[in-house]
Amino acid sequence: MDKQTYWEIIIHPSDFLDQFTDFIIQKTSCAIEFFDILPTPSHFAIIYDDASWQSVLGFDILKAKKSKQPTQIVSRIASNEINIQDFLESLQHFALMLAQNTQDSVGFCYHIEEKFNYDWIKAYQDSIEPVQCGRFYIRPSWEQEVKESYDEIIINPAFAFGSGHHASTAMCLEFLSEMNIQGKTLLDVGCGSGILSIASCKLGAQVYACDTDENAIKECNKNILLNGVMLNALWQGSIADSPMGAPQKYDVIVANIVAFIVKVLHNDFRTKLAKNGVLILSGILDEYKFDIIKAFNDFDMLDTCCKDGWVALKLTL
């Protein structure tokens, strides 16, 4: 066993999932994953028919089957960083102590397999391909520069903040590509990675952006620097939290956010959008399309776009 291998340990407690999870994290100092399994007789039969699964302390299959969400805990630990036998003994001791403290039966079953390490970073990078949306070519920093005559945007995907691959982001980029926003004021609500703000800067707009998520603001700042553009203002919060010096009205507002929040912000959009300005709404599932259109019936519809079950709307006052 060496650093080129790791242990994959799958543990299925009969109960007390949170307590088992806390113990495993403290014991290994490693991240864990959860896998929810189907609480069906056939699935549990597969577990117990497989000789690689071991039952400890009379693991109660009936109790596990009746739990609301049977869950397996998966931990991956470098082989040279743990004595697997010591770990299992400590886990069994923990289960015994938990049983004594709760006056309940506590058992678990487990499956252990030694696996070879995999270059997850390279595999991840290989899975992220550049994408073309309207006038824009979006690529991660490890991809080569584009040779065609597109406006290039560099985004290193992080979390779920927008990299151009999702339909809702792509439709916003396509709408912006069709517009002349040179010199116009634009507000990006829920800016996420900053991809729409960066695109708008490259189209010559004076860009203001906000997001309620602190991590999104951090990612946006990183990507702004990566692309060599400058926003007029970027703040954590919503429209109502605009900093001093921000426009009272915007020529363009773009909001790629969930439908529920779109409805909540209706009055803010109406207050902040200039007369004859353009409001782009995206992040709307097709099933909520008419609900949003009804909520914004005091706006005039300029265009709609549908892609992969998602909808984007272009509106004006």
From Swiss-Prot:
It comes from Helicobacter hepaticus (strain ATCC 51449 / 3B1). NCBIfam families: PRK00517.2-4, prmA. GO terms for molecular function: protein-lysine N-methyltransferase activity. PANTHER family: ELECTRON TRANSFER FLAVOPROTEIN BETA SUBUNIT LYSINE METHYLTRANSFERASE. Pfam families: PrmA (PF06325). Transmembrane segments: none annotated. Keywords: Cytoplasm, Methyltransferase, S-adenosyl-L-methionine, Transferase. S-adenosyl-L-methionine binds at residues 169, 190, 211, 256. One of its GO terms (cellular component) is cytoplasm. The gene is prmA. This is Ribosomal protein L11 methyltransferase. The keyword DNA-binding does not apply.
